[in-house]
Amino acid sequence: RFAVEIVQEIKKLCGKDFPVSLRYSVVSKTKGFGQGAVPGEEFVEFGRDMAESEKAIKYLEDAGYDMFNCDNGTYDAWYWAHPPVYMPPNCNIADVEHIKNFTTKPVVCAGKMEPEFAAKEIAEGRIDAMGVGRQNLVDPEWINKLLEDREEEIKPCINCHNACFNFNCSKGTPNMQPMDDALHLARCALTPPTMQHNKYKIVPTKNPKKVAIVGGGIGGMECALVLKKRGHTPVIYEKSDKLGGMYNYASAMSFKEADKKLLEWYDRELKKAGIEVHLNTEIDPINPLTRQYDEVIICTGAVPKKLPVPGFNKTITFEELLTGDKDHGDKVVFFGGGQSACEAAYELVLQGKHPIIVEYANDLIATPGTCLANASFLREMLVFKKVPIYLEHSI
């Protein structure tokens, strides 16, 4: 009724020809209050099922809506409406294709849509358009690059929700900028100038410098690109045999293909910008190499902490687990149930292994700042996969 009253009032004030689109969740994908249903799970729908949706969309069309921008889910199953990295691509397409048969109005499908896949669906008449949100935040020029056959230049969205939607699970941070420059919920972790162009405006320097960047991870590579845009001459020194740093491990999981593409994007952009890179080169403060630079920026990241307790030498690090440098067998116990641990545990589940999680807090991923869609998916998927989870336990 509320949606009907809204469109009727809009048409009354703006005219019957004024187009109005509705974001329409086809099915709720909900098992109960605060309980979403993950992909592959058999469940009894607690919210709107397909039979109700078939009737509802006709009712809403008759009320005056001109287009339906469709996805799935509710706030109890928010990972369907805003799919995190763990969700499969085009995850809502089957339900959206079905509901199109029950309306004469254009139907849009949203939810990690792949352009090539969407183009095929549109050409075959299964949907009328694809909905795109987050990719516009990370690279506002992506559609022009796609049309101009410059696809390799598109900076990929990694579906992290670390800036665009993390406000939903924490108190957030005060927005200190003028409202004409930024909206708190429309930012991007990979592209800081998004909706913050005044705060992060790249201004050409009047005093060009030669700058050494120690560390070639994501931070070091982004630093080099920004310095280059400003007119400086950055040079990257990386002690390993490849760029990427810790992100090489973070992107190793099977569901992080977009993260791998991001590393490839950085590599191409550095080469295109002509930025000098030295691999297998370790730099310290007394290294004579640093004397030839006006400035030195340290981007070395962090190393795993080794606890001075008996038996700690038998543990393996996050990097060793994900790269397979050490045999971890079939059962792996995670000391801590944060996002990294839950992601790695899910990866082991996908490999047919048997992870166990021991967490001191009263919930998994209890740290503020993680998006609800990411956290709830991992919690509910690990339960669905019957991963043993021990909360409020210590070792």
What are the language-model segments listed below?
Residues 64, 104, 125, 231-233, ...:
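Glycine-centered short loops/turns at secondary-structure junctions
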Residues 257, 261-264, 281, 289-295:
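Catalytic cores of nucleotide-enabled group-transfer and carboxylate-activating enzymes in metabolic
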Residues 205-237, 278-290, 299-309, 314, ...:
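Rossmann-like dinucleotide/flavin-binding elements
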Residues 1-214, 218, 222-229, 304, ...:
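Flavin-dependent oxidoreductase catalytic cores
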Residues 33-37, 79-83, 246-251, 309-310, ...:
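Short acidic, glycine/proline-rich loop/turn micro-motifs
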Residues 236-273, 345-393:
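Rossmann-like dinucleotide-binding cores of NAD(P)H-dependent redox enzymes
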